[in-house]
Design a protein with these regions (language model features):
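Small beta-barrel nucleic-acid-binding modules, primarily SNase/OB-fold domains
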Residues: 2-249
């Protein structure tokens, strides 16, 4: 099985040249590594379910994702290759990088293809979006891991901030100085910030009214900031790349 799988992993995201080999001290969770040199690495393009913190329980498949990444790192003799992102650090100070096993397989694509995480894209670190989407699609079509039971929420089911994949019908599209705002049945509003409009086909966004869409990203509760005006949707989902928004039949 592994030989067949490895050829598939390479097909999703081929190995690049010029990788920096590093030693892994431990796997923090399904998408984060701690290196022996003290750095934390957040894997680009992969978001795995959260481990429980501060009394919260683990999200489904959080432990499975961490254990699988531990096994992949162990199979690579505890050393991996890093390809840093165009943006090399996140706001927590973690190194942002694509991670490769000793055999050249992209570990984000491997996790996605096994249904142990969600494909995500945050500009400008979007070079592998296509192959990572393909890896996730194969898991989704096969009903693997977290796709066994659909994790997609209806827009009106959103009740907490954090990462979500949601679906809904577009009730309104508006463009102003704050960017493009796409409302889903008064429950959630998606936003494309002005600095990201160049990445999107804005004419297509403006035609979305009445269409059924699926979006993913990190939901923000606007009522907590006291900035919620009358008639505004409580939940805001900033779109960080066109791949985070799909039309559905």
């Amino acid at each position: 099985v592994s030989a067949i799988w490895l050829s598939g992993a390479h097909a999703f995201c081929p190995v690049p040249s010029g990788l920096t080999p590093v030693a892994v001290q431990r796997v923090v969770d399904g998408d984060t590594l701690r290196l022996s040199d003290g750095r934390s690495v957040r894997m680009i393009g992969l978001n795995t379910p959260e481990m429980g913190k501060q009394g919260r329980s683990d999200e489904p498949f959080a432990v499975a994702a961490r254990k699988r990444l531990e096994a992949l790192v162990a199979a690579s003799d505890g050393r991996v290759g890093l390809l840093p992102g165009k943006e090399s650090k996140d706001h927590y100070g973690r190194t942002l990088a694509h991670v490769y096993g000793a055999d050249g397989s992209n570990l984000e694509a491997q996790m996605l293809a096994e249904g142990l995480g969600f494909q995500v894209a945050v500009a400008p670190n979007v070079d592998l979006v296509g192959c990572q989407q393909a890896a996730e699609r194969s898991a989704r079509q096969a009903g693997l891991g977290l796709w066994r039971q659909s994790p997609v929420l209806k827009a009106e089911q959103i009740s907490t901030s954090g990462f979500a994949v949601l679906s809904g019908r577009v009730s309104k599209v508006q463009r102003n100085r704050g960017g493009v705002w796409i409302e889903l049945q008064d429950s959630v509003v998606l936003r494309v910030a002005p600095n990201l409009l160049g990445q999107f086909d804005v004419a297509q966004l403006e035609k979305l009214k009445g269409r059924q869409i699926e979006a993913r990203g990190w939901v923000v509760d606007r009522s907590r900031r006291g900035g919620l005006k009358s008639g505004q949707a409580r939940w805001l989902l900033p779109l960080t790349d066109p791949s985070m928004l799909q039309m559905t039949p």
